[in-house]
């Protein structure tokens, strides 16, 4: 099943050591928080930013692969959930293009929502992720994110 358009814009911001895919237990949603989508892509693919995600859902609904699932992307940062710390290792990060609260927050587009649903269902099935393990960045880093 291929729901991802062949758009690949790899980020250099991930651990080179491959992980055991059975470790993946969470999906973490983020919004880019930048005025322009192209600036968000530039940041996510810049070595200096030290931030990335596995996927980016663009305004038009396209899904961009930023870091292959086999690698640990740097998206969760200093994070915790229940008894776990540093959730990068056991999660998939999905960035959603959106200016966020600091830049005139906008509702997600219908195309984005449909793509997010398709990608979420695909990843849930692929990695056997339970529904309560779909989280927002603000859930795992409440003092750093709104």
Model region roles, listed by residue range:
Residues 127-144:
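Acidic/histidine-rich, metal-coordinating catalytic segments
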Residues 2-128, 132:
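Active-site-adjacent loop/helix surface patches within enzyme catalytic domains
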Residues 88, 145-146:
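Charge-rich, low-complexity amphipathic helices
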């Amino acid at each position: 099943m291929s729901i991802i358009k062949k758009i690949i814009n790899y980020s250099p911001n991930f651990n080179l050591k491959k992980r055991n895919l059975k470790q993946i237990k969470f999906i973490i949603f983020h919004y880019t928080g930048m005025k322009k989508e192209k600036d968000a892509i530039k940041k996510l693919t810049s070595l200096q930013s030290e931030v990335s995600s596995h996927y980016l859902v663009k305004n038009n609904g396209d899904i961009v692969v930023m870091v292959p699932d086999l690698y640990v992307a740097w998206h969760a940062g200093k994070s915790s959930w229940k008894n776990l710390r540093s959730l990068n290792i056991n999660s998939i990060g999905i960035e959603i293009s959106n200016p966020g609260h600091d830049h005139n927050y906008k509702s997600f587009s219908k195309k984005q929502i449909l793509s997010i649903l398709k990608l979420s269902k695909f990843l849930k099935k692929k990695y056997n992720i339970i529904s309560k393990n779909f989280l927002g960045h603000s859930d795992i880093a409440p003092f750093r994110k709104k």
